């Protein structure tokens, strides 16, 4: 665990007792802070009590005694309206920060008192609308394969303050959501990666401009940044950073870049002063199929170069990466039919990589629709043999599809798996693909995308070969 001494001897309020909140409370207490924790969910409060974390309903506390509110990233800060605990903190005029800010302050304290430099204990921060988790996991995997001391956490699922304490040459690879960045005013990573920016989480940020601004802070604060320039918003941001004098590199999965990193199909290149150097070829790496994974791999290789890390076996290490659960995860091959779990695709843009990668698709789609639905995926409609519509979005998506291709109102995931399997097995394609890429949130029928993905895997594994 990383101990946080920034509030030593002071009283802090903490709201949100999931994994990251519980870890933050323990880290603060070990650093000498007086913590009062609470959550709207009674189970979180119960867990905190079991871990000897002081709990009291913050609605009835004297907020003039607190110096800060430590807030879980899932709690609304501004939109659609501030949570009551945020209003309390603002009325008391105290700072509101999250667990990544506590990590940043603890690291800064360590660097100041140890005499080490930023690059002696590298902090890699990764953000973007889609691809964050894969890039985070792939970078950590390669560093581990090369023998480095690596700690991976943040939005990928491991609470950042549960990671091992700071020591020289330990590398921290951290996935950051826009919500976490909002709560991290001191964010200054050694290297910051921005993968892409498309409309998402507008319900929490109020506007796309506010969402972009949150993501921008990660790269503007970085000692060195890499930005994908395949998107107009990111290209403009890259140019802004260059004009402002930031150390920033360009990455493209679509076209040549003058100084930076780019992909030509499966081949990955770096370009420096007009000289092109091939870094790796992703051909036949099933866990890194698709142009989106070429971008993820480019970001990882760019980071390694910035860290001055090289290894002659880099392709072997890339090939050994197994991929993440729920992200274009190959579940099973049954005869000529391939089953793919892409449950982490919670919006249209996140479904695009899978739809672009495969052909002869039997698409299971639906759930709780995001703004824009599946309109952005029309360019892939020619690849779809049939769709199986589930959840709240079924009727809406049926209207969008119209007569573009056949569809079934399956409504439930179990029905969809069985219907899609029957149709795919009868298909004469060399390899038919039953693709579960819902392009929607899961909350209408499942607790989260992980539970939804596990349900899909379970239904697929129960299928009997005929």
Swiss-Prot record:
What is the protein's known function?
A: Cell wall formation. Catalyzes the addition of glutamate to the nucleotide precursor UDP-N-acetylmuramoyl-L-alanine (UMA).
- The organism named in the record is Bartonella quintana (strain Toulouse)
The yes or no answer to whether the keyword Ligase is present is: yes
Q: Provide the family line.
A: Belongs to the MurCDEF family.
The EC code for this enzyme is 6.3.2.9
Keyword presence, Nuclease: no
Cite the annotated pathway: Cell wall biogenesis; peptidoglycan biosynthesis
Q: Where does ATP bind?
A: 128-134
Signal sequence extent: none
Show the catalytic activity. Answer: UDP-N-acetyl-alpha-D-muramoyl-L-alanine + D-glutamate + ATP = UDP-N-acetyl-alpha-D-muramoyl-L-alanyl-D-glutamate + ADP + phosphate + H(+)
Pfam families, per the entry? Mur_ligase_M
Protein name per Swiss-Prot or TrEMBL: UDP-N-acetylmuramoylalanine--D-glutamate ligase
- What top-tier enzyme class does this entry carry? ligase
**UniProt keyword annotations, A-Z:** ATP-binding, Cell cycle, Cell division, Cell shape, Cell wall biogenesis/degradation, Cytoplasm, Ligase, Nucleotide-binding, Peptidoglycan synthesis
Q: Which GO terms describe its molecular function?
A: ATP binding; tetrahydrofolylpolyglutamate synthase activity; UDP-N-acetylmuramoylalanine-D-glutamate ligase activity
**What's an example Gene Ontology biological process for this entry?**
peptidoglycan biosynthetic process
Alphabetized InterPro entries for the sequence: Folylpolyglutamate_synth_CS (IPR018109), Mur-like_cat_sf (IPR036565), Mur_ligase_C_dom_sf (IPR036615), Mur_ligase_cen (IPR013221), MurD (IPR005762)
**Could you give one GO CC term from the UniProt record?**
cytoplasm
Origin superkingdom: Bacteria
Q: According to its UniProt record, where is this protein located?
A: Cytoplasm
């Amino acid at each position: 665990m990383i101990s946080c001494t920034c509030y030593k001897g002071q009283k802090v309020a903490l709201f949100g007792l999931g994994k990251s909140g519980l870890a933050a409370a323990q880290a603060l207490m070990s650093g000498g802070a007086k913590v009062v924790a609470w959550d709207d969910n009674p189970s979180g409060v119960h867990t905190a009590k079991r871990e000897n974390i002081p709990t009291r309903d913050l609605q009835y506390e004297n907020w003039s005694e607190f110096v800060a509110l430590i807030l879980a990233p899932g709690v609304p800060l501004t939109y659609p309206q501030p949570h009551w605990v945020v209003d309390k903190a603002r009325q008391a005029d105290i700072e509101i920060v999250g667990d990544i800010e506590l990590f940043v302050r603890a690291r800064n304290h360590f660097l100041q008192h140890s005499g080490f430099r930023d690059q002696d204990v590298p902090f890699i921060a990764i953000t973007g609308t889609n691809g964050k988790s894969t890039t985070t996991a792939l970078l950590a995997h390669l560093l581990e394969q090369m023998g480095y001391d690596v700690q991976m956490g943040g939005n990928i699922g491991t609470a950042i303050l549960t990671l091992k304490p700071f020591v020289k040459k330990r590398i921290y690879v951290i996935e950051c959501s826009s919500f976490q960045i909002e709560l991290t005013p001191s964010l200054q990573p050694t290297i910051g990666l921005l993968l892409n920016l498309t409309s998402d989480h507008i319900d929490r940020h109020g506007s796309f401009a506010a969402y972009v601004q949150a993501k921008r802070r990660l790269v503007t604060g970085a000692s060195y940044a890499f930005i994908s320039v395949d998107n107009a918003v990111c290209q403009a941001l890259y140019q802004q950073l260059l004009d402002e004098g930031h150390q920033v590199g360009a990455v493209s999965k679509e076209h040549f870049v003058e100084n930076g990193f780019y992909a030509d199909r499966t081949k990955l290149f770096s370009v420096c002063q007009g000289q092109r150097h091939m870094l790796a070829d992703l051909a036949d790496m099933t866990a890194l199929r698709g142009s989106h994974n070429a971008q993820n791999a480019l970001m990882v290789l760019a980071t390694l170069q910035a860290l001055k890390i090289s290894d002659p076996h880099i392709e072997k290490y890339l090939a050994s990466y197994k991929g993440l659960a729920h992200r274009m995860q190959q579940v099973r091959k049954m005869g000529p039919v391939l089953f793919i779990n892409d449950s982490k695709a919670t919006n249209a843009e996140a479904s695009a990589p899978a739809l672009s990668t495969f052909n002869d698709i039997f698409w299971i789609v639906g759930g709780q629709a995001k703004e824009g639905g599946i309109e952005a995926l029309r360019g892939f409609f020619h690849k779809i043999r049939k769709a199986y519509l589930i959840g709240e979005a079924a009727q809406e998506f049926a209207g969008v599809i119209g007569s573009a291709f056949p569809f079934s109102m399956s409504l439930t995931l179990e029905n969809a798996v069985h219907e899609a399997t029957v149709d795919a097995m009868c298909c004469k394609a060399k390899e038919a693909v039953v693709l579960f890429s819902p392009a929607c949130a899961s909350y209408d029928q499942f607790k989260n995308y992980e539970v939804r993905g596990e349900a899909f895997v379970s239904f697929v594994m129960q299928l009997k070969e005929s």
